[in-house]
Amino acid sequence: MAKAGSGALRGRYTRWLAALLATAMLVGAGCAQLAEEERELTFRIVPGTASWYDGLPAGVQEADLPVDDGGKTQHIHAWWWPAETADAPAVLYLHGSRWNLTGQAFRIEELHDFGFSVLAIDYRGFGKSDGKLPSETTVYQDARVAWKRLAELEPDAARRYIYGHSLGGAVAIDLAAWLSEQSAKSGAAVPVHGLIVESSFTTLADIAEALTSPWLPMRLLLSQKFDSLSKIRELRMPVLIVHGSGDNYVPSRFSEELYAAAPEPKKLLLVDGATHNNCMRVGSAEYRAALEELFGLEPATADSSAGS
């Protein structure tokens, strides 16, 4: 989720909730149209190319990954940007709402500059991916498909990571919890070395309440839950939680709550003065130090010259 337009989003949420409450009182049940409007409000997809996009970075390989959609094959668009060093860590990048990969390129580049090979995807409905309007279910499915591709690209589980920004943080936590659950059932090691969650929230209802009024029964009204708070308790991997102190869209207290709920090993990095979208840039040195401390990434691996 981007900070821009948070006032307008607050107004849209309030109007949507008023319509939903009126419908519930009149018919005693949910309305398909309102459920669709909820998803539109959750993902707020901006079509086309972001105005600040400078073109596909050199070295990026494009791919389309097949996804089963009820017996019909759809595709999600992906970028694979390998680092220059063969033993570099590899990360699955899961973005938030609004912008497709063209609007995320700057943050993908920052991760690449940290020394990561990066696999980034657009969920169905975003960018060049198939589909129209995503849902909580479809973005979770897309993330799992992308994870399988990352495992093919980087066979060494000790070098695999998951990163999620804002709403993508909820998708990343769901994927990490699912991988933790699968490993617990099988008795095998968790196939990922760590999780990075930046500028995210506890549940969608919590962020909706922050944008509207706390008296509204958001947990009963919303069909899209994105309940990271319960899922993060199930993790079986190190987690780095990052938030900017100046984020006036998603309050940093949500990351503090996620951190409190997460099992060890874990680290909370609050970047002084950073906003919703610039933690890596504003807190670059702190970010690199946190990656080294929690995940054991060598300073040379996370050097800004890597892969540039």
Q: Which functions belong to the PLM regions below?
A:
Residues 73-149, 153:
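Membrane-embedded segments
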Residues 261-277:
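Catalytic histidine neighborhood in serine/cysteine hydrolases
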Residues 246-250, 277-278:
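Acidic catalytic loop of the alpha/beta-hydrolase fold
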Residues 149-153, 158-213, 223:
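Primarily recognizes the serine-hydrolase "nucleophile elbow" in alpha/beta-hydrolase
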Residues 107, 237, 251-260:
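Short alpha-helix in the alpha/beta-hydrolase fold that links the catalytic acid
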Residues 235-236, 241-243, 247:
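Short beta-strand/loop motif that positions the catalytic acidic residue
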Residues 28-68:
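An N-terminal hydrophobic leader/cap segment in hydrolases
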Residues 280-293:
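Post-His helix in hydrolase/transferase enzymes
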